[in-house]
């Protein structure tokens, strides 16, 4: 693998479900050390691309390369030591506690010659501390709020200790406060621990605020990729989403902020 080649690359991929083709000749390199966010309208292929990168969907043509090798020619446990995946809808076994669920992140590192150790205990405790769920360790996961559960799943992915972490719509079904909480956590993992994150998000303004690298998709193709300020323009938003808008600076972060054009003007309230 060349020194300038990212660890994770989707190359010339055709992605399909049975006879329905979602994308053709799709090439997506994931910059090392980035917080990459995939954006686009519904049914454009965002989650399909993420599933392919996560080894959950085999390309009909082309390949996903992990460290220069076809990801489907590598063993499941070997891949799981490098790449973690948080699906869109994760369901915990009934009654399992937070600590026991987070500990499952260590399974790829177990084997006949390597059983549970103090290092595993330390890593699990650290993952729970990093995600702010240590005080919930003995609570059943099914008794937690949506935001708490999502942090627990992220803690399990952290315990897996992979340099690459993929998240499919991690803020789905969460209220705005919990969405910000989860995305702040993802940003901290990227900034403080140097992990490469890839996420699918629906909220364009959240994507522009948190991502260091954006991939904009439409109809199974990449329309633009790069830094948020270069990708999130009024012209591109209208091209990709069909939404006339203005793009201004977010007053809090200076990142691009999409302001939809008014469909109709609302007059002043009657006296």
Kindly give the residue locations of the regions a language model identified.
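Conserved ABC ATPase signature
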Residues: 115, 140-144
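Catalytic Walker B motif of ABC-type/P-loop ATPase nucleotide-binding domains
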Residues: 165-169
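Helix-to-loop junction immediately C-terminal to a conserved catalytic motif
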Residues: 54
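The feature captures the beta-strand-to-loop junction immediately N-terminal to the Walker
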Residues: 39-41
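ABC ATPase nucleotide-binding domains
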Residues: 240-271
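Conserved ABC transporter NBD signature motif
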Residues: 62-70, 79
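Conserved structural motif at the start of ABC-family nucleotide-binding domains
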Residues: 8, 22-25
